[in-house]
């Protein structure tokens, strides 16, 4: 049975093909055209990637024709950039950034998106522009650059609303609410999220908002409320049967462990752990390792490995969150040395997450 490819996987293949056209690698371009064509045939439906494929195919045909003419005359072929190429170059960086984002390589993604941003003037479509603002906002959010993330997401939300793309606008609002919660502005964050939920008529987005409200309540240590929101999110098939459902099962398991409901928590944990491995989700594989060390194996070496794995993924907010929880648990036991150890980890993560390094611009 043929595996269905994601748009991001196919986009990455088309990017590789276009790179060969730019570098005038004739034989490699011919080969990759066939690989890209085969990939498109087995892709989940995505109009943007199909349009990108068509544009690159158009540019490929011009390239091949010009290359052959030059070859016949014994001349050297030189790639001459056109207006189409400037738009294709934008798509090259944008789709590369999307792919890096799906692979959880957020610093690489932001490099691609910043290059795409310099070519936005060649994009004459409001919908495409708003999609760019959404994605770059999401990556800055994952890198804990909340001011930049909010700025881009607010721009995207405004354009989406103007275009009547209401679900996309609500996606922006949901992340803006999450940002306020992560900044411990809980009243404002929860109000934004509840307003978004009232406005939503889209099952997938409604479930995502409920999950975000659950995470906010978890931060506030309102565990019963968090539990309710997570269960409500999992009532939606669109949420339950996808990768995001795995994340919610993990968070629900974490909440239930905190409530002392260990049997139910363990069952959900085992399911979430298996799914995290199935999806190869690096963040949640690390998070599952953390829960295992904290509640099941009761082994701080696993906790330390989990925190280190998150640090290597540049998920500094998550490092800070878990380290601060370890500080709190150590303080409850009057274990000053352990408390100091995790306080230092949390402090280092907090300092670093507020820095915008050279590799992020």
Stretches found by the model and what they are:
Residues 13-23, 54-65, 90-104, 131-142, ...:
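Tandem amphipathic alpha-helical repeat scaffolds
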Residues 34-41, 74-82, 114-125, 154-165, ...:
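Amphipathic alpha-helical segments of tetratricopeptide repeats
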Residues 1-96, 269, 299, 305-361:
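Flexible inter-repeat linkers and adjacent short helices
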Residues 56-151:
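Long, mid-chain structured domain cores
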Residues 21-37, 63-76, 104-115, 145-155, ...:
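Helix-turn-helix repeat elements of alpha-solenoid scaffolds
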Residues 5-9, 45-50, 84-91, 124-131, ...:
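Alpha-solenoid helical repeat architecture
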Residues 146, 150-216:
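Loop-centered beta-sheet repeat module
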Residues 252, 257-322:
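Structured C-terminal portions of repeat-based eukaryotic scaffold domains
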């Amino acid at each position: 049975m043929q595996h269905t490819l994601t748009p991001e996987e196919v986009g990455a293949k088309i990017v590789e093909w276009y790179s060969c056209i730019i570098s005038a690698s004739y034989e490699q371009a011919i080969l990759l055209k066939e690989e890209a064509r085969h990939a498109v045939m087995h892709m989940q439906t995505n109009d943007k990637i199909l349009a990108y494929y068509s544009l690159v195919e158009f540019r490929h045909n011009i390239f091949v024709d010009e290359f052959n003419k030059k070859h016949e005359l014994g001349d050297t072929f030189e790639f001459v950039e056109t207006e189409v190429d400037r738009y294709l170059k934008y798509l090259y960086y944008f789709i590369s950034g999307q792919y890096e984002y799906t692979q959880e390589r957020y610093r690489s993604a932001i490099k691609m998106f910043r290059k795409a941003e310099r070519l936005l003037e060649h994009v004459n479509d409001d919908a495409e522009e708003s999609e760019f603002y959404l994605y770059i906002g999401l990556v800055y959010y994952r890198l804990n650059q909340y001011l930049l993330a909010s700025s881009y997401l607010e721009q995207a939300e405004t354009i989406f609303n103007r275009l009547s793309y209401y679900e996309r606008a609500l996606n922006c609002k949901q992340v803006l609410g999450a940002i306020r919660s992560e900044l411990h502005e809980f009243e404002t964050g929860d109000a934004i999220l509840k307003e978004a939920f009232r406005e939503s008529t889209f099952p997938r987005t409604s479930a995502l908002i409920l999950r975000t409200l659950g995470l906010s309540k978890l931060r506030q240590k309102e565990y019963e409320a968090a539990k309710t929101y997570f269960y409500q999110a999992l009532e939606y098939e669109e949420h339950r049967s996808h990768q995001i459902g795995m994340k919610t099962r993990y968070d629900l398991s974490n909440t239930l462990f905190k409530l002392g409901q260990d049997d139910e928590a363990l069952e959900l944990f085992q399911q979430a752990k298996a799914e995290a491995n199935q999806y190869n989700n690096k963040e949640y594989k690390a998070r599952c390792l953390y829960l295992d060390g904290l509640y099941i194996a009761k082994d701080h070496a696993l906790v330390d490995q989990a925190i280190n794995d998150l640090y290597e993924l540049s998920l500094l907010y998550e490092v800070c969150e878990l380290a601060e929880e370890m500080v709190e648990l150590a303080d409850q036991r009057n274990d000053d040395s352990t408390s100091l150890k995790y306080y230092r980890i949390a402090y280092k993560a907090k300092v670093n997450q507020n820095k915008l390094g050279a590799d992020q611009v």
